[in-house]
Amino acid sequence: VAELAVRCAGVNLRNPFLLASGVWGESGESLAGAWSAGAGGVITKSIGSVPRPGYPNPTIEAYERWGLLNAMGLPNPGIDEYPREIEIARRAGATVIGSIFAGDPEEFARLAVRMAATGVVALELNLSCPHAEGFGTEVGGTPENVEKVVRAVTKAVTIPVIAKITPNTGDA
């Protein structure tokens, strides 16, 4: 059997295949299921300071013959409720990376401290979601804003921090 373990951003992963942040990472059971199916690590659904219902259905549409488009609107239960889902995944043995989103560097730093306290091994900063006003691309749309967020978060926590940035900017 081939050895696929890797170390990325200071995090040991049993292989380089991760469950990306998204709807499948909303519950502890689905995170644990991805781990049990062989994922090298799992990234949670992006979590904010307060619950968000997201957009009403349909949130996924077929696009001509070649693909699907989705716009969820960052639905999540909020940081007060989500730690129990992380605990379920961690009890299953999963390597969990916590994804967070916020509207400004200070809120990102506060959320980072709360998410780090759950025992996640690293943080993903969602600076790329184009679907929710005041978050994602609106916060991370310029290199200067990304730098402010990353600096605030790395001052607040000691675990690795990964900025998920948008490709949708003219200032790349």
Regions found by a protein language model. Name each.
Residues 1-172:
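Flavin-dependent oxidoreductase catalytic cores
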